[in-house]
């Protein structure tokens, strides 16, 4: 059943029809046999331990939370963050990307705060609730011959209609975006889920959106909303041709025709970027190679360190790929971009560049303390006149989750805020970069000076998450606040912290105590009071 809106787009209520019976029980037995014979249960699952461990129960709105300091008026709205939170125990392996999406929200109004946590009610979650157990294949299982067998079990469950893929099988656990009166929960293997924020801050899953049946492919977790035009730019990647499809969605929520883009083989493309004129795609050598998974006991996505990194720059309103320009830079992978803009003949991309990534690092079968990895801030330049490309390193150590004042999306901006990492997942601090300043050379660690204008250190045993910039009503780019979740492993307690984005002072503006711990997660978003009031949903 689809709920039609006046703009022609549709929200589809999710009502999967899984089935129990003899074939279901038989496949359960087969799966248990495969796991018993081929899976090493002694391997630790790091991302199901400590504060990575899920909180199984939802939390309805808890009002009047203790607030230390003050919550500025511009923070009236709802701060939301999504992340993996598996409701049921894994059958075998577990990758951090596998968990069911759970949104943690803090509703702020007139200096008071309310906390809520809700699962995104995906088709996948509803079906596993029907069975009372995990039934869908996990990324953490996709390694070696064991991975091939688990793929076959999944295919049999679908073919025999034990599982229903009518509404997709994604987790909606990666990121959030607000566009055309709708808060969307995203995961790049599925369509967006529409979430309504209620007056008391509660979160309600309404269903998936397919833009009046025009969306027939996956949808990136990192679409870009142009703050001037109100349009949203997005893409999807696939294991079958076309491997990449670009889309534009009007400010009124109308999805334009697809633009297939040719790349040589299926890859993982987690993010992209826009300028006022262009869209920038990243053909990076993180390849989908199931044969190598079986033969070489690798993850199903494996990185090829011998291939160049390719960047495609396409006029953002192009009707086809004929005008795309491809540029090459040294081998790398990129999870997240900060922003992009144009300077004369050049397109500039600010990004977090990673060398020799290994997705197996987040499969959980690793030591407690992961090796530091070189995910560093870079400036890349693509000359549209000469066809040349160059890059320059802007940070001395690992940073990720880059954020900006989103009023500058697609335009030249000065400041980038990011997270300081001591491993692939644990955030030890928040950092502020000034792109107008030169990076200090010879540094091996991040410290104030040069292009680093401030560092907010979380302290021993305290770890944070992606920090979202919320502007005050002012013309200055960095005159606002950063808001983020923090967990204290010393006490087991979590909070939301607000700091001054201009000064990066060690003294927080506000700390909101939360009723229980909040597991580490992925991306966050601040939904303004105005956006809450303009939600176009029932």
Swiss-Prot record:
Superkingdom assignment: Eukaryota
Keyword Hydrolase: no
Name listed for the protein in its UniProt record: Carotenoid 9,10(9',10')-cleavage dioxygenase 1
EC number: 1.14.99.n4
Gene Ontology process terms (BP): carotene catabolic process; carotenoid catabolic process; xanthophyll catabolic process
Cofactor binding, per record: Binds 1 Fe(2+) ion per subunit.
Quaternary structure, from the entry: Homodimer.
Major location category of this protein: cytoplasm
Keywords: Cytoplasm, Dioxygenase, Iron, Metal-binding, Oxidoreductase, Stress response
Induction: By drought stress.
Organism: Arabidopsis thaliana
Organism lineage string: Eukaryota, Viridiplantae, Streptophyta, Embryophyta, Tracheophyta
UniProt note on tissues of expression: High expression in flowers and siliques. Also detected in stems, leaves and roots.
One GO cellular component, as annotated: plasma membrane
Knockout consequences: Plants do not show any phenotype alteration, but leads to higher seed carotenoid content.
